[in-house]
């Protein structure tokens, strides 16, 4: 029934737009042009028309001027099978991007790479922090769906978000935007261009954003999702006849409160129903340890309108980045290109992991990240051959201290550590007279360890767990991809990328200490691990020129998502266990692209099938030794993702244009074995292929349009975008409480656009649809996160 309803909605809304357009006056084509503009992209490392290349791509240019696109997180609905989410647990522009059902298994730690890449001005961003880029001074955003391993390399099995910023113009001028909205939203954005000489241009840019949050924390008095963001930088362009260089130096500062773990989902007994007899579902009917111990239980499943965390979930992100793009025209057929990038990120996060008013468990993370990348390319264009060949180097290093505090460890182990005679407590004669703290220090409670420098006085307050990890990743690659015209109408595309990647990982054995010694790094032992992989990523395809305005293509490509070491662990044995290999994608695509009705209509259709092997999966299970929880990570599954994508753009007349993006996705496990109920203290591995792959909605729909009417010396423009996303299983084991129901989002703007200024009112989530996502940690505690409500704002822009 849902399929019929969705298709009916698409048809009804489309027909409504067509009938509405018929009532508008139509000027003759000679008086005013009403066609779709060509969009030039660099999705294949060279400038090409988006309609001429045989890949599934959505390129956004004019759309970025819409005030409802505040940042890349607002791109939902503009491309089929895209869910561009912000990772609230990261803050600082952390991203959680889903393309064709492929999304990060974990996104809270730099030890794990994302399967969808974000690239800005040719630089791959190796950390999820800072990927939700603010929308200002962006020339183009290209959404490449499906594996892009040949040209973009590792970690592109889902696709690539390729962002290109504007180049300096070489003329004095600029623009600024001032924005105000509800909940204390205040934004200012500025770009200024000038010339230094005839061939040297300079651009300055900056953004400042303040936001007071959309929900109150009734315990602390602060807001949820507060934001204090600043970005400043400069770009210099040297442009000679055959050589040009583009250098950007910039800095980011982003601080506030996290948009995650802000609702208390620690329900008491019988609030959540007991699973049916014999069911493998998790049983939360007895309630959660946190609320039962502290009397802070939630009594209703109604979506709350407030937060009650005893500590604010705060973050602070500082980023410095340098990007250098250079090209040199060797002759009329060959161009040499170089792309160099250096990026440093300092990240701090603290979150009240139990999300309640009780001081149960807090996690604090200090992370330093650096990356360096270098690409050298030779781009060629001859009569029947066009190609790109290159070498690539990438290195990143990160170091992270993280601390688990509050009363959690005291509740679990405080009594044992403070015991004057652990032998009497445990009934072990050999330990008679040994204090509990000493027993922990000599390894009696292994794998639980204690700081050798602790004294009994040190553990009179809260006990803190200390963890540490560092990783060095080096990746080198050589690649080639070319198009050869077999005939006037048939083109062969072939490419291959060779990649060698090495990861060196060190992590400390977690131990218990106190807050004063949180960064002492007095670890009783280390996991010192290394892995190296060599991979090939091929691509082959055929493109047929149907006519001057249409192409049909078929292609097969492969990609891989890096292996590694799962850093969110406590014990050396877990780090050694949770080494995982790359996961592999083999993707078939059959597509058709066309420009119809004298360039008034663009119709693109793609069928894809992406076979995932050795898929990386993670779940949380009880540790029988520590009586706490541990993350288990492995190559545990094979999944088939297949579907159809439809993209339509249509210019009804000089006043009205619309778009329709529809993605259908069928995702199912081919093989999957896991412990279906990891909370029962018994590890039973069984067939789990009947589960739905997480974060794989059956469909996505985006439908909208722009109506522009002359008014005085300017234009009155109205924009509307409707987005629908099917139900999603957000949890690996398909917990009922973690399902996100089918949801709608309506965004709109109306504004007056004069020659050099505009005034626009905009809104997002205008239907004020709310939902809550459930994050249980076994039966110890559970946090929730609620999406943002209706958002309204006004924006003034001026160009000079």
Residue spans of the language-model regions?
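Acidic, small-polar-rich N-terminal luminal/periplasmic segments of exported/outer-membrane proteins
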Residues: 34-171, 590
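C-terminal beta-signal and adjacent terminal beta-strands/loops
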Residues: 407, 411, 655-658, 723-732, ...
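Outer-membrane beta-barrel translocator/receptor signature
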Residues: 114-115, 127, 136-139, 145, ...
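Structural signature of Gram-negative outer-membrane beta-barrels, strongest in the C-terminal barrel
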Residues: 237-239, 378, 390-394, 469-610, ...
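Outer-membrane beta-barrel domain signature, strongest for Gram-negative TonB-dependent receptors
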Residues: 221, 227-388, 394-399, 602-604
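Solvent-exposed loop segments that connect transmembrane elements
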Residues: 215-223, 259-308, 352-362, 403-466, ...
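Gram-negative outer-membrane beta-barrel transporters
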Residues: 386, 488, 492, 609-611, ...
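Membrane-embedded beta-barrel scaffold of Gram-negative outer-membrane proteins
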Residues: 325-329, 335-341, 346-351, 545, ...
